[in-house]
Amino acid sequence: LQQYPIKGVIWYQGESNAHNMDAHSQLFRLLVDSWRTNWKNPQMPFYFVQLSSLNRPSWTWFRDSQLRLMKSIPNTGMAVSSDYGDSLDVHPTNKQPVGERLGRWALNQTYGHGVTPSGPIYNKVEREGDALVVSFAYGDGLRTSDGQSPRCFEIAGEEGMFYPAQAKIEGDQVRLTSPEVKLPRFVRYGWQPFTRANLVNSDGLPASTFRGDTDSIITIINSCCTMKSDPKKQYSNIKTISGFPAGEAGYDLGVSACYGGFIGDYMVVAGGCNFPEPGKKKYY
């Protein structure tokens, strides 16, 4: 196919990768990079379809992973299709709207037409008192697809227990509260394998499944650890970890050989705790 010039790529993602999103995230990057290399076009547009809705546990995580891929790979776009999913059929039958959504990305990003390319894309979340305020790109005219209150938003505090949130649309933002969560920190939306989430923008295009945090991973780690970092090697020596009683049974002195390496959105930690006899050596 390399002998034929192409303007860009549209990719309909199948379900076979959904069981291993970590492998897929690497393979998908490789796919995009290799095609751009083979066609000698490092900016070649690559637009793809997000997995739809189906009652399989991994699909929620996979959809979120695809959103993160779109944000991290330049000149890509993602067509959300969860609103056309079938809880029992892995192959939704209504493909025309999905094709039209791919076309919006191409018209806007590749051909310069003034059409809205996407539904609301999660941008950031901030805490205001007992509420979380979520901001979106492509969030002009936020509303719901069925005229009901926004649903499928959940928030959690420091402990990570999620509760359904009361959602109020405010311009291009959504304000979230829950009587169960006094100091919210985490948010997620459409976090069901088969979701009936209903947030759309003025063009009627649906928002993607997403999860977010009020703090970056660096802020989170710094809040619970004392670290010494080497930016060249991208590692951190964890000196102490909060929660170990200082001076009691050598807990704080027992943290040894800890390593933290940042790989994209992940932090890999390895090491051990040496506890005095008759304690045991523990790894985490």
Q: How would you name each of these model-derived features?
A:
Residues 221-284:
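Kelch-like beta-propeller repeat domains
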